[in-house]
Structure formats: C-alpha cells, structure tokens
C-alpha cells in the first residue's frame, strides 16, 4: 500500500497501515514516516511472522483490522502534555533514541528533523548550547510485535555481504534500511522545539520560562472553540467538525515545520504538527481532528544487525551501518563514502618524527622575519603518501627546539578499490609566478617572504583526468635580497576517474594582505571586535576517536608558534558527502602567521561501459 507523506488517511486506513509496517525495514537517517518503510522485493516483511495464527484485531473506537497475526498487539494510548528539561545536544539526542527503544546518542533522522538540524553531528552539536521541547502528544493507540524470537527472513540473511564490499554493503542498506520496525504509535502531536544557540547567554531557568510562555500561548484553550477531549479518543469519524471548519477538501496530516527566531537569533523555535488535519488553525481546532486523520507520531526499532547473530559478515554490516548513521552521507553516495572510510594516517608517522635535529642547521635553509627575531629552519625533505590519496595537510615544528618547519600529509592507509593511481612523471612545478602580488612578507617587507601562488596540477594531461596530491615538500629560494618559502606538490593520476566538484578552504581577507598593512588592519579589526577575554570561545565537538586527533604534541611549546599556524587542514567523513581528496594547496599569511590552505575535490569513477 503506497503512502505519500502528504496524504491524509482515515481512521480505518491508518490502523491498517500501522499493522502493515510492523516488521518492515527502516532507514534511521530518515524522519519517522510511513513512506520510509522498506519491504523485501516481493513486498513482504523483513522478519518471519507466523501466518497460521491470525485473528481480527480490535482498535480503540471500534475499528477492526482483519487477519492480523497473533504476535501483533494493540494498546490504547493517552493524551499527554510533555515539557522536557533543558538538555544538551547529546542528552536530547539520547532521550529521543530512548523513546524509540534505542541506545546511544547518535542523532536520528527524527531528532534532526524535529530541531531543524543539518545532519552534520559535530557542526550541529557545536552550534547549540541547550535544547528543549513542549507539546501535546495525542496517542490514540500503539501497535507492537512480540519481540521474543524475532527472526529475519532467510532471503534477507542471504544478502548480507560476507566481506567489506562497499557496493554490496551500500546496496543492502539502501534496500532494507538499518533497523526493523517493531512498534508504531498513532495519533497526533503539536510540539514546540527550542534551540538555544551557542552565542546565547540566557540561563536554563530563563529558557524554561520562555518555553512555558510559548507553550501556553500556542496551546491556550479558546472557550468558544473548546470541545470535549472525549472526541479525541472516540475513534469515530465526526465529519461535521471537518465540514464546519472547511477541512474536508483540503489539509494534510503532515505539515511543514514552522521555524521562528528571536530578534538577535539567539533562540530558535521549531513548531511541528503531525496527525489530524492541519490548516494552520488553533491547537484546539486541530486537536478534534486527530481521531479522524491519525498519523504515525513515533516508532520503535531494533537494529537489523542484532538479528544476525553468528552470521558471516555481520561485523562488516554493523560497521557500515554505524558509519552511515554517524555521518549520514546521501544514500545514493553511500558506496563511495564507504570506500573512503579506511584508517587515516600522517606521513611521516608520529614515531618517525626526530627527537633531535636530523641534520645540522647549516644544511637546512632558514627564514628570518625580523631583525632580532629567531630563525625558522625549513625541512625540505619530500613527504610521500605512497600513491595513496591525501585527505589533509598540516605544518609541524620539528626538532628539539621546535624550530624546524615541516609539512605533513594525511592520507588513507590504502587506496580505495575503485581508484587506480599512478605517478605522473610529466608534471613540473611552476618555478616562480610572474605576479609580484603572490610574494607576501610575514612581518616586514625587507625580510623573508612567502609565495602564496596556488599549487595545482598543470601537467601534460590537461583533460578531465583526476589528479590527486600524493607528495609535498617545502623549498626556500633566494630572490634578490630576500628568501622566499615555496610549496611544492606531487600528483598521481587516475585515468578512470574525473573530478566532479572542487572547492578551496575559506580564505580570509587577511590572507590577501601583506606586510605592515596586514598587521595594522588586523589590530584595527581586533579592536573593533568583542574582547576575547570576555567572549566565550565556541567549543568544538570532536567525534574523532584517534589517539592524536589534533596531531602529536611537541615536547615543549615552540616559541615559533607565533609565526606558524599548525592547525590541521582536512576534510573527513563529517564533511558531506564524506569522500573528499586534496587536489591542490597554497601557502597563506594570515595575521602574521604562515598557514596552509587546501583545495578539495570529489571524484567520480567512470564505468567501463561509458568509456566504450
């Protein structure tokens, strides 16, 4: 039975639909909708249900659904107003999961939809300080299956990949989802969801007062429109109510979210209605239509992988599902996303970093940025990823004193199966750009400069063949009375792939300024901005579980950190769609610091059929 998100079901059809989705697959990255349920190719449930013990299932209000398995039960619901505590992002996400009979704090599709989030866990969690909601939940009834001895159908088990095959794993998830529906709650809900943004200074008590005020305002009872709550549970169609308000020909059971901001955008309200017939009328008018047009307001799930105990390949599917739920790439790009979810490592590896100086200072070129300032020595050794795609870069201050500048590359531990990289011997770096504007002093114009010319592939293969950075090194050249720092890159090619999309890191205006003017403008803009001492820094949510997620710590804090930005520049799985590679880079000077920016690209592998 097909179901469109904006189709209004009558009471009997809604009950039949609630029964029919029990045991179907579900993609937890989706909002709770009937349309997101998944069947087997022949339209069957994913789990085995005994067809020999069927009976008529009676619902509240006298609705009867025929030929329902005895393992499927129905319980009467209740009418409840719930106002949550003021919770953090992870606490609220965990609460939503618990309401769906799930554990953990990974945001679900329903959670993201209710609070109008972007599906990027770290960014969403970093953008808000607290979350809360206040609303009416009209549960007419709930339908559940007995979970004892719940078993997947053999045809579903046979499709579980026995190895890490990204295409097969992505196909399984797209076909069957990530979970199995074991419970459905039908009725309606009218809820205000509140997001306190990170920049807000309101205390939790103030947020609670605002929430109560907005809730009382939205859910107030108009004595003229007030109806008996008993009509909500009667389950009998009362068409006179719909006709009286002109709701019969129009209206939907699922309305779009209404998003409202406070004046300074510190607080956001997301108002959502599900079930009933919603034409933007008052809460009281909407309330009396819920029994005539109920919709799904909640579901309970069990993970598909929990029903695969002992089956070969369960671990691979479980890992793929966890990655999909954590980072939520578009389902149509899940194949490419999974291919790139290999361990990432830095070259050189942490254990290879020198504890002392590898070479004498005389053999390392140096840069001087002021008359009395320290020298910055430059490690000009070539860093090679071994024909493996580079996904990030960083500067690192090596040596016992932390005064040797080196470049490091983050790369995949292996090359994805769909890529076939080979080094391009025809590529030759551009020696020196003609435009003088690319040579930028770090402090004063009479001392060392940095070449900020973008380094990209310009080899003999000028077609759409994909070029990926696999090597990098630094070089120092004398130009007149000054020394200039250059970035050099080496590239590998894949003739079977093309570049689909490319973009650079955000470049600040300071990176285009030079010398004294950069320092002056930076100080002026700093004076006009809020005092850093009184401004609370925005905390970044890091879901990276690596031993050194922010890079190895030097033995001592180098003095030259005031001249070098050692921040890691990379795009990981949390950056949609999660399989970016580095295809270019450039040096920058920002606020008196040498930094590096990367150019990222998405690749598309061309099938052999399309090449014929």
From Swiss-Prot:
One Pfam family recorded for the sequence: MACPF
Q: What is the lineage of its organism?
A: Eukaryota, Viridiplantae, Streptophyta, Embryophyta, Tracheophyta
What is this protein identified as? Answer: MACPF domain-containing protein NSL1
Identify its protein family.
Belongs to the complement C6/C7/C8/C9 (TC 1.C.39) family.
- Annotated source species: Arabidopsis thaliana
Q: Tell me which residues make up the MACPF domain.
A: 5-338
- Which segment of the chain is annotated as a signal peptide? none
What is the role of the protein in this entry? Answer: Negatively controls the salicylic acid (SA)-mediated pathway of programmed cell death in plant immunity.
Extract the InterPro entries matched here. CAD1/NSL1-like, MACPF
| A single cellular component GO annotation | nucleus
Null mutant: what phenotype?
A: Constitutively activated HR-like cell death phenotype with endogenous accumulation of high levels of salicylic acid (SA) and constitutively activated defense phenotype. Dwarf plant with spotted necrotic lesions on its rosette and cauline leaves. Accumulation of high levels of callose and autofluorescent phenolic compounds localized to the necrotic lesions.
An example GO BP is: immune response
Gene coding for it? NSL1
Keywords noted in UniProt: Hypersensitive response, Immunity, Innate immunity, Plant defense
Q: Does the keyword Cytoplasm apply?
A: no
């Amino acid at each position: 039975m097909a179901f469109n998100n904006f189709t209004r079901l009558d009471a009997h059809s809604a009950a039949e639909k609630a029964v029919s989705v029990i045991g179907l697959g579900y993609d937890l990255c989706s909002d709770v909708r009937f349309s997101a349920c998944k069947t087997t190719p022949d339209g069957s449930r994913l789990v085995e249900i005994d067809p020999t013990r069927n009976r008529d299932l009676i619902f509240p209000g006298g609705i009867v659904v025929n030929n329902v398995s005895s393992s499927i039960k129905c319980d009467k619901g209740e009418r409840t107003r719930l106002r949550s505590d003021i919770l953090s992002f992870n606490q609220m996400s965990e609460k939503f999961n618990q309401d769906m009979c799930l554990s953990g704090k990974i945001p679900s599709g329903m959670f993201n939809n209710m609070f109008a989030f972007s599906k990027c866990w770290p960014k969403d969690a970093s953008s808000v300080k607290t979350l809360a909601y206040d609303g009416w939940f009209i549960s007419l009834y709930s339908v559940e299956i007995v979970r004892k001895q719940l078993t997947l159908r053999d045809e579903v088990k046979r499709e579980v990949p026995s190895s890490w095959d990204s295409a097969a794993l992505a196909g399984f998830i797209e076909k069957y989802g990530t979970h199995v529906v074991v419970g459905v709650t039908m009725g309606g809900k009218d809820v205000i969801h509140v997001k306190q943004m990170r920049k807000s200074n309101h205390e939790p008590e103030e947020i609670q007062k605002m929430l109560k005020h907005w809730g009382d305002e939205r859910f107030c009872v108009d004595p003229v429109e007030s109806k008996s709550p008993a009509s909500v549970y009667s389950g009998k169609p009362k068409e006179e109510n719909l006709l009286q308000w002109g709701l019969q020909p129009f209206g939907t059971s699922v309305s779009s979210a209404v998003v409202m901001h406070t004046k300074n955008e510190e607080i956001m309200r997301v108002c959502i209605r599900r079930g009933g017939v919603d034409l933007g009328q008052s809460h009281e008018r909407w309330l009396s239509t819920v029994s005539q047009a109920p919709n799904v307001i909640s579901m309970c799930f069990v993970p598909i992988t929990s029903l695969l105990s002992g089956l070969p390949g369960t671990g691979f599917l479980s890992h793929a599902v966890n990655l999909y739920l954590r980072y939520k790439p578009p389902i149509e790009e899940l194949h490419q996303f999974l291919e790139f979810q290999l361990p990432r490592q830095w070259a050189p590896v942490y254990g290879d970093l020198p504890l002392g100086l590898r070479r004498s200072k005389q053999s390392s070129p140096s840069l001087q940025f002021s008359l009395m300032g320290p020298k910055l020595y430059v490690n000009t050794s070539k860093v090679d990823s071994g024909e493996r795609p580079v996904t990030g870069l960083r500067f690192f201050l090596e040596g016992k004193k932390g005064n040797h500048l080196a470049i490091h590359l983050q790369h995949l531990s292996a090359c994805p199966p769909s890529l076939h990289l080979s080094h391009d011997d025809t590529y030759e770096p551009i020696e020196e750009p003609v435009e003088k504007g690319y040579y930028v002093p770090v402090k004063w114009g009479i001392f060392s400069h940095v070449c900020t010319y973008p380094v990209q592939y310009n080899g003999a293969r000028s077609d759409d063949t994909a070029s990926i950075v696999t090597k990098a090194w630094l070089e120092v050249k004398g130009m007149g009375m000054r020394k200039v720092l250059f970035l050099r890159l080496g590239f590998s090619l894949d003739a079977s792939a093309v570049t689909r999309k490319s973009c650079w890191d955000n470049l600040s205006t300071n990176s285009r300024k030079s010398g004294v003017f950069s320092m002056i403008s930076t100080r002026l803009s700093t004076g006009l901005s809020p005092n850093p001492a009184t401004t609370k820094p925005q905390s970044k949510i890091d879901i990276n579980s690596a031993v050194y997620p922010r890079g190895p710590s030097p033995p001592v804090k180098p003095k030259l950190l005031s001249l070098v930005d050692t921040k890691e520049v990379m795009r990981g799985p949390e950056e949609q769609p999660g399989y970016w590679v580095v295809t270019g880079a450039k040096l920058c000077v920002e606020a008196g610091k040498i930094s590096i920016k990367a150019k990222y690209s998405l690749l598309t592998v061309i099938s052999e059929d399309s090449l014929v």
